[in-house]
């Protein structure tokens, strides 16, 4: 194997894929990058056995095909120290990788590419195309509600579901729920999968680029996403996701409409003196007044008030202030609508004139 590549191009692609590398004493090849040259393309692959990233780079100079694996951390550190526009030459000889650039030379150990674990064959049950900015927004609108280390392992991820021509992303930690949906241009086979928390966050980083069309394949236990120059594959969480539809309000009556900026500022003011552990605040709405109150373990109190256009039934609820702030930060609307269920056990929040994103937060006992 032999090829030449510009350093800034190689470094850019290495940075994208080395985030998933892990130190593994029992399986050291997981610390390596699979380097493969064939058909005028340089492929760089990393995996932690759950997430796999493949970056593809066109080679415009002469090359000799081949494949091997080298330390991901070492090659990235080498590239970082070299000048951006320098040319890097890499050649595999006698199971060693020879690297040269300008006046610098390196010899790295290799491990056989034959022992590198990767998803070469991917059988899918459903596939579709979607704009990267749409998928990115759906993830951003819901990811904060995912469980982190819940014993109910199926909560430590995001539900991605296609049903009735709609693609939905859903996340819940048992105390709050977030849902976002978009209509697909083409009808595709039904699927309902749970993407692990870490994979969701890694995907979000990869989608932080210029908008492009994504090709997505859904397998029985994994999902694969093709971007312009990168392939993202992750294992899925097995298990049945909770019935999120039973949490969403079937009837939404008497909405409380409030300016999102006014509410956010009010919440931030009283959050200063909220209980450090429970983070609870009280909200009282009556006669066009929206009052927010908090107290803490040191018997300190805070109160803030602003006017709204609501003259219905008096409302008194308690809620986690940071859960509410998370929702407001993800609703890009001048006004938001608050709905209270009959049992007064939860509240549903949406943008005033857009229900494509909805949030349900459990209320605290008063």
Curated annotation (Swiss-Prot):
The keyword Kinase does not apply. One of its GO terms (biological process) is DNA strand elongation involved in DNA replication. Its main location: cytoplasm. Confers DNA tethering and processivity to DNA polymerases and other proteins. Acts as a clamp, forming a ring around DNA (a reaction catalyzed by the clamp-loading complex) which diffuses in an ATP-independent manner freely and bidirectionally along dsDNA. Initially characterized for its ability to contact the catalytic subunit of DNA polymerase III (Pol III), a complex, multichain enzyme responsible for most of the replicative synthesis in bacteria; Pol III exhibits 3'-5' exonuclease proofreading activity. Forms a ring-shaped head-to-tail homodimer around DNA which binds and tethers DNA polymerases and other proteins to the DNA. The DNA replisome complex has a single clamp-loading complex (3 tau and 1 each of delta, delta', psi and chi subunits) which binds 3 Pol III cores (1 core on the leading strand and 2 on the lagging strand) each with a beta sliding clamp dimer. Additional proteins in the replisome are other copies of gamma, psi and chi, Ssb, DNA helicase and RNA primase. InterPro entries: DNA_clamp_sf, DNA_polIII_beta, DNA_polIII_beta_C, DNA_polIII_beta_cen, DNA_polIII_beta_N. GO terms for molecular function: 3'-5' exonuclease activity; DNA binding; DNA-directed DNA polymerase activity. One of its GO terms (cellular component) is DNA polymerase III complex. Disulfide bonds: none annotated. Belongs to the beta sliding clamp family. Keywords: Cytoplasm, DNA replication, DNA-binding, DNA-directed DNA polymerase, Nucleotidyltransferase, Transferase. It is found in: Cytoplasm. It comes from the Bacteria. This is Beta sliding clamp.
């Amino acid at each position: 194997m032999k090829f030449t590549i510009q350093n800034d191009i190689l470094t850019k692609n290495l940075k994208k894929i080395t985030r998933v590398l892990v130190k593994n004493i029992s399986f050291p090849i997981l610390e390596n990058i699979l380097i493969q040259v064939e058909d005028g393309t340089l492929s760089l692959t990393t995996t932690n056995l759950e997430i796999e990233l493949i970056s593809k780079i066109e080679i415009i100079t002469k090359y000799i095909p081949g494949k091997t694996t080298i330390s991901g951390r070492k090659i990235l550190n080498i590239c970082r120290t070299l000048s951006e526009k320098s040319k890097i030459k890499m050649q595999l000889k006698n199971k060693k990788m020879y690297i040269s650039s300008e006046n610098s030379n390196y010899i790295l150990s290799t491990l056989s590419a034959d022992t590198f674990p990767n998803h070469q064959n991917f059988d899918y049950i459903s596939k579709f195309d979607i704009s990267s900015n749409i998928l990115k927004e759906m993830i951003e609108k819901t990811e904060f509600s995912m469980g982190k280390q819940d014993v109910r392992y199926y909560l430590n991820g995001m539900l991605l579901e296609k049903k009735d021509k709609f693609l939905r992303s859903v996340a819940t930690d048992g105390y709050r729920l977030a849902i976002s949906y978009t209509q697909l241009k083409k009808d595709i086979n039904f699927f309902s999968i749970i993407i692990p928390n870490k994979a969701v966050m890694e995907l979000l980083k990869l989608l932080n680029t210029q908008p492009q069309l994504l090709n997505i394949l859904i397998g029985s236990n994994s999902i694969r996403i093709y971007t312009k120059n990168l392939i993202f594959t992750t294992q899925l969480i097995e298990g049945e996701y909770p019935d999120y539809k039973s949490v969403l309000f079937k009837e939404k009556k008497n909405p409380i409409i409030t300016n999102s900026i006014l509410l956010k500022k009010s919440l931030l003011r009283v959050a200063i003196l909220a209980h450090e552990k429970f983070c609870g605040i009280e909200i009282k709405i009556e006669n066009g007044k929206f009052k927010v109150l908090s107290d803490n373990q040191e018997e300190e109190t805070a109160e803030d008030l602003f006017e709204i256009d609501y003259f219905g039934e008096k409302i008194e609820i308690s809620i986690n202030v940071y859960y509410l702030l998370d929702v407001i930060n993800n609703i890009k609307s001048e006004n938001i609508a608050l709905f209270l269920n009959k049992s007064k056990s939860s509240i549903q929040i949406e943008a005033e004139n857009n229900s494509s994103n909805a949030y349900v937060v459990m209320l605290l006992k008063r």
